[in-house]
Regions:
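Metallocofactor- and cofactor-centric catalytic cores in central/energy metabolism, strongly enriched
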Residues: 1-267
């Protein structure tokens, strides 16, 4: 009875159910960006209020499909505004992303792999590990970090390791060092995962059995346990080689607009 009352199938009408689920998924991403921006000092009362309004609609049986459709579309617009808010937070702290060559190979030193999209956590780890004799690699959503001037200045931000988030089982095994999740996209590890005791989470991310790094009363996060663990690990196993180009943010793209148009006209 409880499942029928609170589960997804509590909504009998298929269209209404689908709209509520679509709205829920949109609000999840929206909330993640708002939380991340707030952590970096940028908030919007208007966007926060919309998040509450949208969530209320997902559980209000009196909201009709026309209203739900409008809310789904509005969530897209508000999501774009949340992205702009987060972009402001990131660029105010770390500068505008610029064209950057990122290594996808590996070095000889042990490493820490950082996933998610919280740039402040990455910066804190880079500062704490700068003289530790280890390298820091980005994974998945953290790849764009290499384009920010305020982060690429750290020489031990070595490169990017791995591909899509769903390849974690294979790539975390071959990385051989600690992994830090700063936001979501955690794939539950298989029972025999050799890397499970090396995974850490922080912020809103978390998973049963993974050690979590909380901030102290001053908001400082101590990543020394990852750094010390990394020192005892082997260097990453190479799965790729070469470089990739990143940094095509809106500011950089606007600077390249004229050369791009000229190249198009020239064929």
């Amino acid at each position: 009875a409880a499942q029928a009352e609170i589960g997804v199938l509590r909504t009998g009408d298929i269209d209404s159910r689908s709209l509520r689920e679509l709205l829920t998924y949109g609000l999840k991403g929206f909330a993640a960006y708002l939380h991340h921006a707030a952590e970096l000092g940028e908030e919007s009362a208007v966007l926060n209020a919309y998040l509450v309004r949208g969530l209320v609609a997902t559980v209000d049986s009196q909201v009709d499909n026309t209203t739900l459709t409008a809310l789904v579309l509005e969530t897209g617009a508000k999501g774009l505004a949340a992205m702009a808010l987060l972009d402001t937070a990131n660029t105010n702290l770390y500068g505008h992303p610029e064209l950057t060559q990122v290594s996808i190979g590996v070095g000889e030193r042990p490493g820490i792999l950082v996933s998610g999209h919280d740039l402040a956590d990455l910066e804190a780890l880079l500062i704490q590990s700068k003289d530790a004799g280890i390298d820091v690699y980005t994974h998945s959503e953290m790849l764009p970090a290499h384009g920010y001037p305020g982060l690429k200045k750290y020489p031990h931000l070595y490169g990017n390791y791995g591909n899509a988030w769903w390849k974690q089982h294979q790539e975390f095994t071959s990385f051989r060092g600690p992994i830090l999740f700063t936001t979501n996209c955690i794939v539950p590890p298989p029972s025999n995962a050799v890397y499970a005791n090396k995974v850490f989470t922080t912020g809103a991310a978390g998973f049963p059995g993974y050690r979590h790094i909380d901030p102290d009363s001053d908001g400082h996060k101590d990543f020394s346990v990852l750094i010390e663990l990394a020192k005892s690990c082997q260097s990453p196993e190479a799965i790729e080689d070469g470089t990739i180009t990143i940094g095509f943010g809106h500011n950089q793209a606007s600077q390249l607009a004229q050369p791009i148009l000229e190249a198009i006209h020239e064929g």
